[in-house]
């Protein structure tokens, strides 16, 4: 059979079918595995992906985190601000680049210069964490030079003798056996400036690094400064040292951290000596506490203003300054064991020039009572000038009457508590709104309150009121008073109590807590924008965590006019002037 040239028809058909199948396989492969994976693909799916990539690129890109160079110190201002973020631009995405997904980023938290100090409290291995104090090294004109001229510090008293023993004064004899064997001194009631500074020198958590300080102490003798120029000097002289101090502080980097709000100082006098409202030469005191920069600082005084927020009351110094815990514990045990034959007692003089004073009524009631002991004080020689006579009377009394002095407060209140005598107050400004750091806010635990208006009108019998208190309650109150003794005395500045906190320790702890809370409020933006300064006394009575105030039962006591124009006849000015008369009497 003759062969036909070329491939048979059946083979050609098979070849064409195979070629066609391979063609479509290549088409599908090219479409799904090559084109779909190319960045520039024009397919529907790839076009949507490209649109999404461009949309993401148009979002603002986050600024990369800044890593602070640890070798570069923080600048002085409290707020270390970041530069504004740069605006992101849409750039062409090259084939080798992958589109970056950008998430929404919140504004970075502010960085404050005091945050390092806050973090020290988190170091549990550091016993001083959160407790460091930085002390300014002031030029001697602000402190030591005043002591060298101690004879000029008071018009009525030579203060030089009280400078001995680190400000405690000369030791007291114990011929009558009223005191314990050690720790008793003839301490002047206005010596807190020196005592506090010398105690600070022994503070266990001092630091030279202000960036870790929980607070900053300014060792300016504000009380001595105002004392030396009050009589016979013009206002320029009275204000000079305070203005000089503020100028010096404001040039310091430590001041710029919080504008002075972490600074504190001590003025061992009543607040009214530092609150001159006008520049009239006849006006009283200096204006330290009204200077704008000084208002940022906290000032510790023996009597604060109920209507101002930058001064805080600390106890008057007593005669007892123990060197060790055992001295305190032995004294407390002795006060518990005493027999007290007198129901109540009073040491003081009448105030005939003050129509609102109830002292004359108290003296009259004491004279007519068979269960009251009276020490009448006036100019000249008096047992009121004898620490042993005063302490002996208090030790033999269950209750000690503590009306207002020439101002709200009296040193006598702390002398009586030191003797284990339950204080009887007649005005909340004498203790309850003053010493809120050192005394319980529930005043009924340690004292009796008899509103002075009832005494003034003759409607209240002190004897009957005190006799109505059950003996078991009296015993409980006396124990509370005795337990408070460490908190209302200043230990010997040359030593330190080990387990007990004295008035210095309580004050420093309170200042640290105040500054720490303020710093946290600044960071969290929780500062109280509704704070009313003239109601400061109400805020001091709030419990921890409370911020809201309202009407109070003591409003009538603090509603009297406040310093209208700062004239010399206003109540606070008169109180300050009259307090100086007590330096002539020798007894407040």
UniProtKB/Swiss-Prot annotation:
Q: What class of enzyme is it?
A: transferase
- Residues on Cytoplasmic side: 1-14
User: What domain of life is recorded for the organism?
Assistant: Eukaryota
Pathway(s) of this molecule? Protein modification; protein glycosylation
- Which GO MF terms are attached to this record? glycosyltransferase activity
Membrane topology (UniProt): Single-pass type II membrane protein
State where the protein is found.
Golgi apparatus, Golgi stack membrane
- Lumenal compartment: which residues? 36-588
Transmembrane ranges? 15-35
Keyword Plastid among UniProt keywords: no
The protein's name: Xyloglucan galactosyltransferase KATAMARI1 homolog
Primary location class: Golgi
* Keyword set, alphabetical order: Glycosyltransferase, Golgi apparatus, Membrane, Signal-anchor, Transferase, Transmembrane, Transmembrane helix
Q: Domains: what does the record tell us? A: The cytoplasmic N-terminal domain interacts with actin, while the lumenal C-terminal domain contributes to the activity of xyloglucan galactosyltransferase.
Q: Name one GO cellular component term.
A: Golgi cisterna membrane
Q: Enumerate composition-biased segments (Polar residues).
A: 567-579
One Pfam family name from the record? Exostosin_GT47
Disordered: region residues: 549-588
* Cited InterPro entries: Exostosin (IPR004263), Exostosin_GT47 (IPR040911)
Taxonomic path: Eukaryota, Viridiplantae, Streptophyta, Embryophyta, Tracheophyta
Ranges of compositional bias, category Basic and acidic residues? 549-566
In the record, biological process GO terms are:
protein glycosylation
